[in-house]
Regions:
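Residues that scaffold, gate, or flank divalent-cation-dependent active/transport sites
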Residues: 1-113, 117, 242
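DNA-contacting surface of Y-family translesion DNA polymerases
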Residues: 5-7, 14, 206-347
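Acidic, metal-coordinating catalytic segment for phosphate/diphosphate chemistry
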Residues: 24, 321-420
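Short acidic, glycine/serine/threonine-rich loops at helix termini
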Residues: 24-27, 50-54, 160-168, 232, ...
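Short Gly/Ser/Thr- and Asp/Glu-enriched loop/turn motifs at secondary-structure junctions
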Residues: 111-115, 155-158, 296-300, 345-349
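Short beta-strand-to-loop capping motifs
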Residues: 118-122, 321
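Long, highly charged, low-complexity intrinsically disordered interaction regions
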Residues: 130-193
Length: 420
């Protein structure tokens, strides 16, 4: 077991804006987020469109994030609207500015548009007598100035504050929960299923279940050397986290050692394989352009075709000759997709990711490739990039993007895939 007395016991807050997108949309219309049934939908004109957010009252009807537009009952008291990303960003920034009245910028970490961490160890006592009183004050100011309700997790570290917020604060009467090291056996260990714990997905859960691990307590008591043998460094992290230990600090900003450039898309309807290939080509066009903009070439390709029901196909491949050309990437993806994908299946999700970059001027010439033709391809691709940059991404498009399967032109002008 671990000796918690050797660990630093800080006052870290994890703050989540309750039903953020739906709440902002309600407030913009002068509606009460807690009493209104409202759904934010990716595209209100498409019945298969995904629900991005729902108010608590709508969730009571069984409609939640990830549901589809056609699942919403036809009722006069239900509002269905498109997202407004600019408005969401403005409100998110306003809330962060409220938090920065109390702490220096280095003590705030923006985890997502509607969630952030604050380390108030050295500052809360200047404004309130206790951490709980400080949280009440902060929640009140955010509500009074933006109309947004917040839930707050208080913890000895970032992990415990996050879990306290997710597991307890969201369901408590005052929206605040505090988890300390001494609470680990009574609050953290009973959590199950394992996938409800931060950082554990269904695949990892299945592997742990085979070893008789069903609760976080089981995981905490399991010999970490076996976890390390099976999962590597991830196994060590899981064991530490299951015991409530997280050495990361808000001030220590995480640096990505092996960045990737990726793009994914949830399709508005079920696509046949040949149609999914069109969208995959559009996604590859986008990521290849972004790699060229950084003057890089990529060595590793990872792609996924997700079926409309469950499962799908994913594959990672490392190239001998790194590239930033769409045709090279598409050729590799289709080589494996044609072999691995079920041609009779219907598809709903697609993704492509490029990684393992080197500078494009460091790429070695290949004796097995026509370098003159490659140079022409690169010049053409960069010319199209410049046209897109100057006139917009719709200036030059492949013919397939104008087919019924194409989605490129329907997504022009969107932010994060949604309307501004």
């Amino acid at each position: 077991m671990y000796n918690y007395h050797l660990l630093e016991d800080r006052d870290v807050l994890c703050i989540d804006q309750k039903s953020f997108f739906a709440s902002v949309s309600c407030i913009e219309k002068g509606l009460d987020p807690l009493e209104t049934k409202l759904a934010v939908v990716a595209d209100t004109k498409r019945q298969g469109s995904v629900i991005l957010a729902a108010t608590p009252k709508l969730k009571e009807l069984g409609i939640k994030t990830g549901s589809r537009l056609f699942e919403i009952p036809h009722r006069n008291d239900i509002y269905i609207i498109n997202p407004s990303m600019r408005k969401y960003l403005n409100v998110s920034v306003a809330i962060s500015k409220i938090a920065l009245r109390y702490i220096p910028p280095e003590d705030l970490h923006q985890y997502s548009i509607d969630e952030f961490f604050m380390d108030v160890t050295d500052s809360y006592h200047r404004f309130s007598s206790t951490v709980h009183a400080f949280c009440e004050r902060l929640k009140r100011e955010i509500y009074e100035e933006t109309g947004i309700y917040c839930t707050v997790g208080i913890g000895s570290n970032m992990l415990l504050s996050k879990i306290a917020m997710d597991v307890e604060a969201k369901h408590s009467q005052n929206g605040i929960a505090e988890w300390r090291y001494q609470d680990v056996p009574t609050k953290l260990w009973p959590i199950q299923p394992l996938r409800d714990f931060w950082g554990i997905n269904r695949r990892t859960e299945a592997k742990l279940n085979k070893r008789g691990i069903f609760t976080i307590g089981d995981l905490a008591k399991y010999p970490y050397k076996f976890l390390k043998k099976e999962f590597g460094i991830l196994g060590v992290d899981m064991h530490l986290h299951a015991n409530g230990i997280d050495q990361s600090k808000v001030r220590e900003k995480h640096k990505i050692s092996n960045p990737s450039i990726c793009k994914s898309q949830i399709l508005m309807r079920d696509y046949h394989f040949d149609e999914a290939k069109v969208v995959m080509q559009e996604l590859i066009e986008d990521v290849a352009s972004r790699v060229r903009a950084r003057k890089k070439v990529a060595r590793t390709i990872h792609f996924a075709f997700g079926y409309s029901d469950e499962g799908g196909v994913h594959k990672q491949y490392t190239l001998k000759d790194p590239t930033n050309l769409e045709k090279d990437i598409y050729k590799v993806v289709m080589h494996f997709a044609d072999k691995l994908c079920n041609k009779q299946a219907l598809y709903r999700t697609l993704s492509i990711s490029l990684s393992q970059f080197i500078n494009e001027d460091e790429r070695q010439l290949s004796l097995f490739e026509d370098e003159y033709q490659r140079k022409r391809d690169e010049c053409l691709a960069k010319t199209i990039d410049q046209l897109h940059l100057k006139y917009g991404k719709g200036m030059v498009s492949k013919a397939v993007s104008f087919t019924e399967a194409g989605t490129k032109h329907g997504r022009l002008g969107l932010m994060a895939g949604h309307k501004m």
